[in-house]
């Protein structure tokens, strides 16, 4: 779960806010001496200060210009919940996270996405060019196993008439989908492992099954559930635009958008220990114009 680290930072941010300026009150008492709130604040600032002040500052700047609704956050949360299945809560817990703190981070990420989208130049010519290689979303089931021998064993059972979904429940090591018969959410080009995606799009008819596909995750068998024919540009324009925008939500473009937002906010860092917190966002480089040129 790639966003968990930022959630952990946001929890530290909340602690820093509570501790800032609290003074000499003890948070831990020992016979050897006390650990004061000031000492804890300074130690946490040294370790996490730059990352925390970045997130707190950007959140305040972005909230002033963009709105993320509870419905949007819940929709994003549900995607992760479905992706991780029964292991979702334990994954949060093992990373010292709660549902609330994870949703707070999702809200922040959505704010950054909206700022990035606002910084894009989505022209008609760019969409038409993108349409040429764009394909509609595809829906498949898959069975993931660790070794080729097991994949061949499953192939034999499929040839003998056993159902793909039943075999996914029995064999697949992808715990997020195995209980649902291996069913994956619809996906488009560029969203999955390249080898997996190529094999999935090569399937022509409903219920067709691929050969054994080796990816970075292991060995797959893929069954086609739904594949929509590509329509005309006029018919598909809304889908093409959504896919294009999604493809442009890269770290490079997000950084470029945040640089622009930071410059417009006229920030003034008062704590000398944090003077370099925004160095990556105030330096002048070619990347600062990346998102407007895509």
Swiss-Prot record:
<keyword id="KW-0732">Signal</keyword>
<feature type="lipid moiety-binding region" description="S-diacylglycerol cysteine">
    <location>
        <position position="22"/>
    </location>
</feature>
<dbReference type="InterPro" id="IPR027304">
    <property type="entry name" value="Trigger_fact/SurA_dom_sf"/>
</dbReference>
<keyword id="KW-0413">Isomerase</keyword>
<protein>
    <recommendedName>
        <fullName>Foldase protein PrsA 1</fullName>
        <ecNumber>5.2.1.8</ecNumber>
    </recommendedName>
</protein>
<dbReference type="GO" id="GO:0005886">
    <property type="term" value="C:plasma membrane"/>
</dbReference>
<dbReference type="InterPro" id="IPR050245">
    <property type="entry name" value="PrsA_foldase"/>
</dbReference>
<dbReference type="GO" id="GO:0015031">
    <property type="term" value="P:protein transport"/>
</dbReference>
<dbReference type="GO" id="GO:0003755">
    <property type="term" value="F:peptidyl-prolyl cis-trans isomerase activity"/>
</dbReference>
<dbReference type="InterPro" id="IPR037041">
    <property type="entry name" value="Trigger_fac_C_sf"/>
</dbReference>
<comment type="similarity">
    <text>Belongs to the PrsA family.</text>
</comment>
<keyword id="KW-0472">Membrane</keyword>
<feature type="lipid moiety-binding region" description="N-palmitoyl cysteine">
    <location>
        <position position="22"/>
    </location>
</feature>
<feature type="signal peptide">
    <location>
        <begin position="1"/>
        <end position="21"/>
    </location>
</feature>
<keyword id="KW-0449">Lipoprotein</keyword>
<comment type="function">
    <text>Plays a major role in protein secretion by helping the post-translocational extracellular folding of several secreted proteins.</text>
</comment>
<dbReference type="Pfam" id="PF13616">
    <property type="entry name" value="Rotamase_3"/>
</dbReference>
<keyword id="KW-0697">Rotamase</keyword>
<dbReference type="GO" id="GO:0006457">
    <property type="term" value="P:protein folding"/>
</dbReference>
<dbReference type="InterPro" id="IPR046357">
    <property type="entry name" value="PPIase_dom_sf"/>
</dbReference>
<dbReference type="InterPro" id="IPR000297">
    <property type="entry name" value="PPIase_PpiC"/>
</dbReference>
<keyword id="KW-0564">Palmitate</keyword>
<keyword id="KW-1003">Cell membrane</keyword>
<feature type="domain" description="PpiC">
    <location>
        <begin position="135"/>
        <end position="226"/>
    </location>
</feature>
<dbReference type="InterPro" id="IPR023059">
    <property type="entry name" value="Foldase_PrsA"/>
</dbReference>
């Amino acid at each position: 779960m790639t966003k968990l680290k930022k959630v952990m930072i946001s929890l530290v941010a909340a602690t820093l806010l509570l501790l800032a300026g609290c003074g000499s009150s003890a948070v831990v008492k020992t016979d050897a001496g006390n650990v004061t709130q000031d000492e804890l604040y300074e130690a946490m600032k040294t370790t996490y200060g730059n990352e925390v002040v970045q997130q707190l500052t950007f959140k305040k700047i972005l909230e002033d210009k963009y709105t993320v609704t509870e419905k949007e956050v819940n929709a994003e949360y549900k995607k992760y919940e479905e992706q991780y299945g029964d292991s979702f809560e334990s994954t949060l817990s093992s990373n010292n996270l709660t549902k609330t703190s994870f949703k707070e981070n999702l809200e922040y990420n959505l704010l950054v996405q909206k700022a990035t989208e606002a910084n894009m130049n989505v022209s008609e010519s760019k969409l038409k060019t993108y349409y040429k290689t764009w394909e509609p979303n595809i829906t498949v089931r898959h069975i993931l196993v660790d070794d080729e021998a097991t994949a061949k064993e499953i192939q034999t059972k499929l040839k003998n008439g056993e159902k793909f979904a039943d075999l996914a429940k029995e064999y697949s090591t992808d715990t997020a989908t195995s209980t649902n018969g291996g069913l994956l959410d619809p996906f488009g080009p560029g969203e999955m492992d390249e080898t997996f995606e190529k094999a999935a799009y090569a399937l022509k008819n409903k219920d067709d099954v691929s050969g054994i596909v080796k990816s970075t995750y292991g060995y797959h068998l893929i069954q086609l559930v739904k594949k929509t024919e590509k329509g005309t540009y006029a018919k598909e324009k809304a889908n093409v635009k959504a896919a294009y925008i999604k493809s442009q939500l890269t770290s490079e473009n997000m950084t470029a958008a945040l640089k622009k937002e930071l410059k417009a906010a006229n920030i003034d860092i008062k704590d000398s220990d944090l003077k370099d917190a925004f160095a990556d966002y105030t330096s002048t480089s070619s990347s600062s114009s990346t998102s407007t040129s895509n």
